[in-house]
Amino acid sequence: MAASAAALRRSLAGAQQGRPFGPPVAGSSEFPALARRSTVSIAQGEERRKNVYTALQAIDRELREKMKGKRYVVIKPNFVNVFNQLASSHADAMRGILDYLSESFQGPVVIAESSAGDTRRGFDNFRFQALTREYARQQVKLIDLNDEAKFETVALLDADLHIVPCRIAARLVDPEAFVISSAVLKTHNTVIASLSIKNMVLGAPLHAPNSVRPSWSDKRKYHVGLRQTHYNMMVTAQRLDWGASLIDGFEGMEGNGPSSGTPVASRIAIASADYVAADRVAAETMGMDPEWLGYVKYCGQLGLGQFDPARIDVIGAKIADVQKKYRMHPDIDRELQWRGPMTELTPNLGWTHALGDERRG
């Protein structure tokens, strides 16, 4: 018994100094690798609408398979700022998606968003209303998820690492809907980059309709600490598990994203039936290390999608040919602190102290 305890103390001490715990148990892995391959398409050109259509058409077979049995499609745009077009989804990106769906899906289409601001104002400012007329045959409707006020609940961690309930839009987890995350290629002020996962998981939480007082917003429950944010995003992605991702990088955003950065003329669109693979490839097109994106890596480790580049097939344009070095947010050093040791709480807790951990907080 004493020998076993001493061995465990040595193993723990090695881990604390950056050395591995030791050889893995034969046949086991902390996070089993996802064996299946995933495909990500990249389209590049001088027309946003055409890029989006081309990127989706390139993975048509995969998308049609996932759309089987679905009653309707939900397109989830990004309206992080209902006044700044650069920060938000463009109507021409919607047209590219709707052009593709007109050929591949027989059923109504809903464009649904839960902006942190006034979603209806975003529909007006970015001229989404015209889409309902142009695509009347597809019965396109615009829905403010905050006004719809139907929700399910997911458990998150708060700033004190206690669990709290969060209301997420029921329509985004409707088993009868094929959900497309229509994101924008942007840097971010907390989680390094805002891509298809970020678009979904921070668009899903609801806030009070504008007519309701006192107001409330469950989106705030994600902004409770760097580590908690990445974890909470993973938990929410696991619950949502949508069908396809489309990332519009015709004009990306660098610097002070996701709302106030400056434009980058990447002139691309990225599409995949695997949102983890889509976000990994998107990060590479921005010239950043995908390992920086904790929430994307966590989703990959959980098996929600493919994070291993050796198992991702990129079709269309090559990453190296479209890659641009995006300028990161000014707070990038702070944002990356999630990767290091946790110093917010003393590590000298419970059984580690009993086994000889003499660290002091």
Map each language-model feature to its residues.
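N-terminal and secondary-structure boundary signal
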Residues: 1-361
